[in-house]
């Protein structure tokens, strides 16, 4: 009998420093496939730095990152990333279709022509987020929620195995939040790993399978239900924070 190896992400002894000091210290994480993971922590906890280190925007001073037992740095095409909205130049002159089509470059390379499959992937991704009707519209003409849907479509069109999203729910309406969670759950049903930086400690947090509590180091990594029933959130944010 043959077995398929789990799509597992491993982070071993990761430390990241900026000129003003250490941002992440001795990070050890193991994340199994088919999980929707939420990362929460106070401002300056290193949440965005962790994702940027995974995608190699930031170089650590120590540590290694593996995916399925092999160095992740050799598997960049398998990583999909949605940055914070504040990091995107929304005045850049590009339409919705072209933003999403850019996701296919990791699959086909910079100097290849887009295939029929690429066009089908982009169309399907825009349909999933209900944005196909805006395909010719410039991204700066969209609302905040619509812009976030476009970047989610780009993530889907890439067909990556490891999906990283930095505060995708900031500034979006309730309907867009529902769409995003629904599509992310579809991805984990396909045995992918989805990691989301999340700032809302309200009811939406229960959508995550597991939570990582981060404040420069790992405070806790456990099932969401266990963390919500513990005192670890109050330890991280202060005694005034609690979850039902």
Swiss-Prot record:
ABC transporter domain sequence ranges = 9-241
Q: Which Pfam families match?
A: ABC_tran
**For binding ATP, which residues are annotated in this chain's numbering?**
41-48
**PROSITE patterns according to UniProt:** ABC_TRANSPORTER_1, ABC_TRANSPORTER_2
UniProt subcellular location = Plastid, Cyanelle
The record's annotation in InterPro entries points to: AAA+_ATPase (IPR003593), ABC_transporter-like_ATP-bd (IPR003439), ABC_transporter-like_CS (IPR017871), Metal_Ion_Import_ABC (IPR050153), P-loop_NTPase (IPR027417)
Q: Which keywords, in A-to-Z order, does the entry hold?
A: ATP-binding, Cyanelle, Nucleotide-binding, Plastid, Transport
Q: Which GO terms describe its molecular function?
A: ATP binding; ATP hydrolysis activity
This entry carries the following GO cellular component terms, namely:
cyanelle
Q: What family is reported?
A: Belongs to the ABC transporter superfamily.
Protein name as catalogued:
Probable ABC transporter ATP-binding protein in ycf23-apcF intergenic region
This chain's source organism reads: Cyanophora paradoxa
